[in-house]
Amino acid sequence: MILKANCKINLGLDILRRRADGFHDLETVMFPVAGLYDEVEVVRTAAPGAEFRAEGLAVDCAPGENICLKAFRLMQRHYGVDGVAIRLGKRVPFGA
């Protein structure tokens, strides 16, 4: 499976409240940017766990703490998903 995570411009952002989990509830208006995206490829494998590989621009986070692996761990915990290879083609600059 290959997904395109489109870039978007935040036109408005309102922080509503801080939640008990430390995150915030937000209200936002975003505008998609055509043709600028990160590409995420997920392939099932026979090996347990997740293999992660990033290509393109630098991924600015600690190893094992990127959002792709966090999503995998949630799917693993809640749905028993196991054995995947994840490739992130990073085209959108971090924080953009």
Question: Which residues does each predicted region cover?
Answer:
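ATP-binding N-lobe of GHMP and related small-molecule kinases
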Residues: M1-F94
